[in-house]
Amino acid sequence: MLRVAVPNKGTLSEPAAEILSEAGYRRRTDTKDLTVVDPANNVEFFFLRPKDIAIYVGSGQLDLGITGRDLAAESDAPVRERLALGFGSSTFRYAAPAGRDWAPEDLAGRRIATAFPNLVRKDLAGRGIEATVIRLDGAVEISVALGVADAIADVVGSGRTLGLHNLVAFGDSLCDSEAVLIERDGAGDENAAARDQLTARVQGVVFGQQYLMLDYDCPRHVLDRATEVTPGLESPTIAPLADQDWVAVRALVPRRDVNSIMDELAAIGAKAILASDIRFCRF
């Protein structure tokens, strides 16, 4: 039986459960349940703290897991990504008191508070910077005001929370994170087919969230230009219409770009442009 770790709480929990449900797997009915057996798919799900999931998967006790890329990197567990899931996006950056221009090199000899000490130490080592890293499990932003640290390294969203504590982010992101499906690095043939099947199912759901099907009628004389705009995955589907000067075109397009793509098609003479949702896709 395939053994899969799922976040039991936090921002990753509900989207992960929703994707697995859409992929055809059994969903837990009580948030207190720590395990759910899905006999129809021969899978057992374990609901664990997101920060612990990579450790369980890396040890080989579980076959697959859903966690954050930053959490997997921080764990230092021997895991690898099978699939990026498209939710839970965040950046991990340094921040320090506002009022001056900061650079990572300015951290030399200073105290840095963070909930991700391994990520920070690796980054500092790569830059040749020596600093004191202080591990805190939460409310990292307040550490500077309390005199515990000179700077922090933390997950940054809009920057509003940093601003409330008179902090400003600086330098490049240490980690661009999102939810990922992971497996043990060097995982062998045991349960390989089952791992591949779950990955394919989940990938189909993620793809359906990120792409739309675009149909439109196109004058033949601008078909080459139109297919440059909508190349599809492999190639667009092109079918003749009753009017020989026109063809019907169908192609998958990124959801985030659909309006600009429709604008381009309309500008070159395409008509009846229709975007449709897709629920699943297999490659």
UniProtKB/Swiss-Prot annotation:
UniProt protein name: ATP phosphoribosyltransferase
Pathway(s) it belongs to: Amino-acid biosynthesis; L-histidine biosynthesis; L-histidine from 5-phospho-alpha-D-ribose 1-diphosphate: step 1/9
Known regulation of activity: Feedback inhibited by histidine.
Keyword rRNA-binding in annotation: no
Species per Swiss-Prot/TrEMBL record: Mycobacterium sp. (strain JLS)
An MF annotation (GO) of this entry: magnesium ion binding
Task of the protein: Catalyzes the condensation of ATP and 5-phosphoribose 1-diphosphate to form N'-(5'-phosphoribosyl)-ATP (PR-ATP). Has a crucial role in the pathway because the rate of histidine biosynthesis seems to be controlled primarily by regulation of HisG enzymatic activity.
Subcellular localization: Cytoplasm
Family stated for the protein in its record: Belongs to the ATP phosphoribosyltransferase family. Long subfamily.
Enzyme kind, highest EC tier: transferase
Catalytic activity: 1-(5-phospho-beta-D-ribosyl)-ATP + diphosphate = 5-phospho-alpha-D-ribose 1-diphosphate + ATP
Subunit structure: Equilibrium between an active dimeric form, an inactive hexameric form and higher aggregates. Interconversion between the various forms is largely reversible and is influenced by the natural substrates and inhibitors of the enzyme.
Cofactor section: Mg(2+)
GO cellular component terms listed in the entry, alphabetical order: cytoplasm
